[in-house]
Each structure stands twice: as structure tokens, then as C-alpha cells.
Amino acid sequence: MPVVFNDIMVTYVEHLKNILNHILDSYQILNEIEDKPGDLSKIEKEMLKINGFIRVVSNKIDTDKIPTSDFQTLKIKFSRYLENYSFEKEIKTMASLYSDDVSRVKNMRLKILEALKNKHMMDDARELTVNL
């Protein structure tokens, strides 16, 4: 079933692939941040993008409309990530106290990346984009 975005018709699979690519792009940006003073806002921005797109995939994308069984597994991993990890409060606390502390900023970024890598979630997302 096609989905219409800004007068452009895309298939449901293309829509999912586009969302997964947004997640992977933000994940790559998180990987490449150099942990300088002030980077906490960049980390927060990318983390919020990732969480938003993961929430869309978990809540809005129907598994019956995606032809590959790998999607169901990834959707479960996304749901578990949303249930088990939340960095918003820590980032808000850090922003006012430690936003220029490079080691704390780096540690926060690494914890977010570790959570995203858990159970090979990002690898599975990357593989699914190739297979769709």
C-alpha cells in the first residue's frame, strides 16, 4: 500500500527503509562526535531523533506489510530499547552541570551507543535496509 508524503508516493517498504536510514544516519553522527565542550547538545539532538524514529517503527509500522521476517525481530528489539533505556533525564541534568566536562560528555555518548548496539540492534537495522 503506498503512502503519500509531500505529494510523493512511496511504498510502505520504502517508507520503513527511509526511517531506518534516518536512524542509522543519526547513529553514525553519534559515533563521529569528537567529545568537545558543547557537544552534549549534539548528542541529545541525535539521541532524540533516534528515539523518535524508533518509536515510529515500534508503534506505527505494521509487521504484516513488511515482507521480511527480520523486521519482526528488529521491531521487538526497538520496543525493548524504548522500554529499557532513557537518557533524557541524565542529559538534562548534565547539561546544566557538566556540559563542558569532556569526559562526562564522552561517557554519556558511549553509554547511548552501547545501548543502541545492544543485541546487535544497529547491525540488524543496517542489514534490514540492505535486504528490503
Walk through the language-model features, giving the residues of each:
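Long, low-complexity or tandemly repetitive, helically biased scaffold regions used
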Residues: P2-L132
